[in-house]
């Protein structure tokens, strides 16, 4: 049976970002994705070797999941039920896509070597629960990226976007500065690296017992 559509929830703004006509937005997005690629390349420098099983939570149309699959063997990617996303997923052969909620991940504890969430946590009604779930199903690494506030909203205002909402992108329920996001992630994992590909914050963290 097909999963029911998610009503009243903003799935995200991935498509607008990846297909933007504005050359500045395209450039910033390319740099952000390159930063994620660099973070992925650092994983596996310990005795465990490269990750073998990877999960992306909130995968959108699958761009990041596809890049993950180019590096790692098994990639599972999930997002909320949405007909548009299902159409996008058909373009990618490698990752295994499914519908699920970040608040209740349908996997056993310690299932994945690395869990990735890129522009997801800001959308969650309960980000603490989402973070705990990612830590539960992960066994080694977390790679997490969110808009860096208040910079992200300021950029929207400068571009004349979402002015009536003071620059807040639709669906962004949570807002972190670089420092507050590091503090947030540190609840469940040891933060090893923080980068700031403008206007985002990206964190690589190691889960308890994730390195020998």
Predicted features along the sequence, with ranges:
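Histidine-centered divalent metal-coordination motifs
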Residues: 123
């Amino acid at each position: 049976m097909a999963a029911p559509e998610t009503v009243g929830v903003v799935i995200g703004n991935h498509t607008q970002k990846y297909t933007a006509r504005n050359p500045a937005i395209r450039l910033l997005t390319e740099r952000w994705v390159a930063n994620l690629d660099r973070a992925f390349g650092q994983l596996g420098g310990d005795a465990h070797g490269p990750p073998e099983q990877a999960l992306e939570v909130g995968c959108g149309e699958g761009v990041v999941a596809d890049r993950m699959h180019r590096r790692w063997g098994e990639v599972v990617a999930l997002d909320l039920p949405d007909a548009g996303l299902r159409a996008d997923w058909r373009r990618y052969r490698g990752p295994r896509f499914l519908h699920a909620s970040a608040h209740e991940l349908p996997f056993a504890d310690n299932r994945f070597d690395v869990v990735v969430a890129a522009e997801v946590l800001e959308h969650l009604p309960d980000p603490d629960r989402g973070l705990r779930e990612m830590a539960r199903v992960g066994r080694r690494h977390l790679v997490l990226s969110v808009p860096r506030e208040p910079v992200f909203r300021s950029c929207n205002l400068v571009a004349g976007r979402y002015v009536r909402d003071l620059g807040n992108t639709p669906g962004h329920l949570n807002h972190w500065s670089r420092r507050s996001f590091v503090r947030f992630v540190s609840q469940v994992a040891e933060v090893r690296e923080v980068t700031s590909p403008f206007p985002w914050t990206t964190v690589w963290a190691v889960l308890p017992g994730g390195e020998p």
